[in-house]
């Protein structure tokens, strides 16, 4: 029980402190039992004024008045059950009037939902027609991830508290008995302010100078979704900053010495450098290892996204800007240059040696990477690659090294559904080659009908390892050996030659990399090129590459 109280105290005191950090100075509380933890946290906070009103409908409108008068966001808090429903009129008013009302509804813990417990209704998404953002918070526990969720969600929600996107937001907060936090732990209640510059359309370079004047910086660029990227290259050239470029950034098309492509394999093989600051541009990167590093590094992080909703994954940045990458970097060009030559050269040496190891590996490899490497070689500048999720996009991330081709993928939800159909839609306007695994292909075989009915030409390179190859890289492979093949390997034994006949595609099967090397990808027809691979062999050969890169890293640093 002591651990529960400590976890509850940490959670609600952190939540109250984060609200203060984003500008909340007043909270209107409608008394109730389930809201006890937060009510006490707000009451104990030295710089938050609490108002008490027993009628939730009136309390919410009173808060609307506070916002109008103070021009600051104000929070309202109620207990669980029908009490929350009384907030609806004021929330609707706030939506139409673009008023930053923060709605906090206390809730029963998950085990008391939908079982007939008293004062328990479905409060999740209950205001979804009227709020700009909503989230069902995790229940208090001892994990760091639960506290991080508060930081992440407040970072995301804060964009609706100020600027052009103002409007009401809703946090539903479940609490488990006992409900009283430790009121002696007031040192957890902080009054620090968060900087909110991500609504600026221009940048005050002087505000960032103390960060950008440090030597060890990185630019990390994810999916840019057709945005212009030339100023990223220009800034990197002037200020000697390495660019870790995701394959969807479209920066790998440029033969630029500062563009680093092998970073995923480098981090996967043990690279861990001290970095002063990181400028993250665009959507989150594909690389799991780079995202894990971003989550743990102490580097100051700047996020640049030209979206009205920022994507903070894998961790909330220190500062974020809603602005195009070109405008952001252009605004920083007048700063004095910093001597970072040795820092940049260290990354360039790693990149050069990493590429050499990859080249040597591909010359003798017989796994899926070797097939993907050959596909990249065969793809002309007139063609674009559409890459399926799971293993194909990861292999392309590792093997696409400065070739002038466009790469596309569905990296919103990262699912394997609808890949064939999305690629065919693109093939109406571009020459597309689809790289896809057998399970993803099976999942959307019906999508091929559009090609048959409308004569849409597209080549499909089908990596067939008869199952889910990516699961071989996850802990389940070792911890659930007796069940792995049935639950995760999921072999289907399908013969896709019949699929090709059904939808009038040409079909060619390759049982080895050497066979595929001699093949020609025809652009004037629709062909399925099936590449037969072995999951276990693929995993083992990848481990050899990781080991060689690890040895190279330790010999270079």
UniProtKB/Swiss-Prot annotation:
| Enzyme class (EC, first level) | transferase
Q: Does the keyword Manganese apply?
A: yes
Sum up the protein's function in the record's words. Catalyzes the thiamine diphosphate-dependent decarboxylation of 2-oxoglutarate and the subsequent addition of the resulting succinic semialdehyde-thiamine pyrophosphate anion to isochorismate to yield 2-succinyl-5-enolpyruvyl-6-hydroxy-3-cyclohexene-1-carboxylate (SEPHCHC).
Report the co-factor binding details: Binds 1 thiamine pyrophosphate per subunit.
* Reactions catalysed, as given in the entry: isochorismate + 2-oxoglutarate + H(+) = 5-enolpyruvoyl-6-hydroxy-2-succinyl-cyclohex-3-ene-1-carboxylate + CO2
Read off the PANTHER family from this record. Answer: 2-SUCCINYL-5-ENOLPYRUVYL-6-HYDROXY-3-CYCLOHEXENE-1-CARBOXYLATE SYNTHASE, PROTEIN PHYLLO, CHLOROPLASTIC
Provide the protein name. 2-succinyl-5-enolpyruvyl-6-hydroxy-3-cyclohexene-1-carboxylate synthase
Q: Which CDD domains match?
A: TPP_PYR_MenD, TPP_SHCHC_synthase
Family (UniProt): Belongs to the TPP enzyme family. MenD subfamily.
User: What species is given as this protein's source?
Assistant: Staphylococcus aureus (strain MSSA476)
The gene designation is menD
> What GO molecular-function term can you cite, just one?
thiamine pyrophosphate binding
């Amino acid at each position: 029980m002591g651990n529960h109280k400590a976890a509850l105290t940490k959670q609600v005191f952190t939540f109250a402190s984060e609200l203060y950090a984003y500008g909340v100075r007043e909270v209107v509380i409608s008394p109730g039992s389930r809201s006890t933890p937060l009510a006490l946290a707000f009451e104990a906070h030295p710089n938050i004024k609490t108002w008490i009103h027993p009628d939730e409908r009136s309390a919410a409108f009173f808060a609307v008045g506070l916002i109008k008068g103070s021009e600051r966001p104000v929070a309202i808090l109620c207990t669980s059950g029908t009490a929350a429903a009384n907030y609806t009129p004021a929330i609707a008013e706030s939506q139409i009037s673009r008023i930053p009302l923060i709605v906090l509804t206390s809730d029963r813990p998950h085990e008391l939902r939908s079982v007939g417990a008293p004062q328990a209704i479905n409060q999740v998404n209950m205001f979804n027609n009227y709020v700009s953002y909503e989230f069902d918070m995790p229940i208090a526990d001892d994990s760091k991830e639960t506290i991080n969720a508060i930081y992440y969600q407040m970072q995301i929600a804060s964009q609706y508290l100020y600027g052009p996107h103002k409007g009401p937001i809703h946090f539903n907060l479940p609490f488990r008995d006992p409900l009283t936090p430790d009121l002696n732990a007031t040192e957890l209640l902080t009054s620090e302010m968060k900087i909110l510059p991500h609504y600026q359309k221009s940048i005050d370079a002087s505000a960032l100078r103390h960060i950008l004047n440090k030597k060890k910086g990185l630019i990390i660029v994810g999916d840019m979704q057709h945005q212009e990227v030339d100023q990223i290259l220009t800034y990197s050239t002037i200020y000697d900053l390495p660019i870790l470029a995701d394959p969807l950034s479209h920066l790998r098309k440029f033969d630029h010495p500062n563009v680093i492509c092998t970073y995923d394999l480098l981090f996967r093989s043990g690279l861990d450098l001290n970095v002063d600051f990181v400028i993250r541009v665009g959507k989150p990167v594909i690389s799991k290892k780079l995202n894990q590093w971003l989550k743990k590094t102490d580097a100051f992080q700047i996020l640049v996204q030209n979206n009205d909703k920022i994507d903070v994954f894998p961790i909330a940045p220190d500062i974020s800007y809603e602005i195009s990458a070109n405008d952001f970097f252009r605004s920083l060009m007048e700063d004095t240059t910093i001597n970072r030559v040795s820092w940049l050269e260290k990354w360039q040496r790693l990149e050069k040696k990493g590429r050499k190891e990859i080249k040597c590996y591909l010359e003798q490899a017989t796994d899926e990477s070797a097939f993907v490497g050959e596909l990249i070689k065969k793809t002309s500048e007139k063609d674009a690659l559409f890459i399926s999720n799971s293993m194909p996009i990861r292999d392309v991330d590792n093997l696409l090294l400065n070739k002038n081709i466009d790469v596309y993928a569905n990296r919103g939800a990262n699912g394997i559904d609808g890949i064939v159909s999305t690629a065919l839609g693109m093939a109406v306007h571009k020459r597309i080659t689809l790289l896809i695994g057998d399970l993803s292909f099976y999942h959307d075989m019906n999508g091929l009908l559009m090609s048959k009915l409308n004569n849409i030409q597209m080549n499909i390179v089908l990596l067939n390892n008869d199952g889910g190859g990516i699961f071989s890289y996850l802990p389940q492979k070792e911890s659930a050996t007796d069940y792995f093949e049935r639950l995760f390997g999921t072999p289907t034994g399908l013969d896709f030659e019949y699929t090709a006949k059904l939808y009038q595609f040409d079909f060619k099967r390759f049982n080895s990399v050497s066979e595929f090397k001699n093949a020609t990808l025809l652009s004037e027809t629709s062909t399925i090129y099936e590449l037969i691979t072995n999951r276990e062999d693929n995993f083992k050969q990848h481990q050899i590459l990781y080991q060689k890169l690890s040895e190279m890293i330790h010999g270079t640093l």
